[in-house]
Amino acid sequence: MMHILVTLLLVAIHSIPTTWAVTCTGCVDLDELSFEKTVERFPYSVVKFDIAYPYGEKHEAFTAFSKSAHKATKDLLIATVGVKDYGELENKALGDRYKVDDKNFPSIFLFKGNADEYVQLPSHVDVTLDNLKAFVSANTPLYIGRDGCIKEFNEVLKNYANIPDAEQLKLIEKLQAKQEQLTDPEQQQNARAYLIYMRKIHEVGYDFLEEETKRLLRLKAGKVTEAKKEELLRKLNILEVFRVHKVTKTAPEKEEL
């Protein structure tokens, strides 16, 4: 009886698809047969060549990048290729095609519409969420900002804290109109956060940014759900848009009671 149970367990384990074992939310698992056809279906593809069952900080960073990319654009495929140097040597020929160093995994490539046009992430660059975003931004017209951030808002809010009050009010009015045009609920929520911070900085001055950052960090460090942590992180990312190297504008005087 015990022998039968062990046999059934082994069969079940070997029947589990490898895509279940490799946890990378939003990633497509490619192999030698599907690689070229899949990459050619997208304007751009970021592909990570790695060991068959990756783990650790670099894999976690790539997974986080995948989540951010899916929120930001439909024109970018995020994929993985598991390379085995044992058994049937799965995908080893594909790794050899791109001169992947199996002693220095992972190797990350950005493909531009076909399997022969690509750029490799330099081996000296750390595999982090921010570096992967920068890699895509530097080599494509795509924008993958920090979670919560809106490209159009970021572009017009540079040095917002230092511009005259009248210009701040004009920007508030302008972005209020843009916020009303947004159809995605999450984007609408993020836009509301921008507008709240714009009004607060206009009313209180730059000190608000420092005080609000500390408050949100305290909340994030407390006992909150993962969903709440993600919400707080989005707000912190939006707040960073307003940060300036030097404050040149005098804060509004507080009214005496």
Curated annotation (Swiss-Prot):
Molecular function terms, GO-annotated: protein homodimerization activity
Effect of residue 28 to D/N: Abolishes homodimerization and subcellular targeting of pip
Pfam families reported for this sequence: ERp29, ERp29_N
Entry GO terms, CC: endomembrane system; endoplasmic reticulum; endoplasmic reticulum lumen
Known outcome of mutating residue 219 to S: Affects subcellular targeting of pip
Effect of residue 212 to Q: Affects subcellular targeting of pip
Consequence of changing residue 60 to Q: Affects subcellular targeting of pip
Main location: endoplasmic reticulum
Keywords: Chaperone, Developmental protein, Endoplasmic reticulum, Signal
This protein's record includes keyword Chaperone: yes
Consequence recorded when altering residue 53 to S: Affects subcellular targeting of pip
Places the protein is found: Endoplasmic reticulum lumen
Consequence of substituting residue 84 to S/N: Does not affect subcellular targeting of pip
Result, substituting residue 41 to S: Does not affect homodimerization. Abolishes homodimerization and subcellular targeting of pip
UniProt-listed CDD domains: ERp29c, PDI_a_ERp29_N
Region annotation (CXXC motif) ranges: 24-27
Subunit architecture: Homodimer. Interacts with pip; the interaction is direct and does not require pip to be folded.
Note: 'Windbeutel' means 'profiteroles' in German.
Protein name: Protein windbeutel
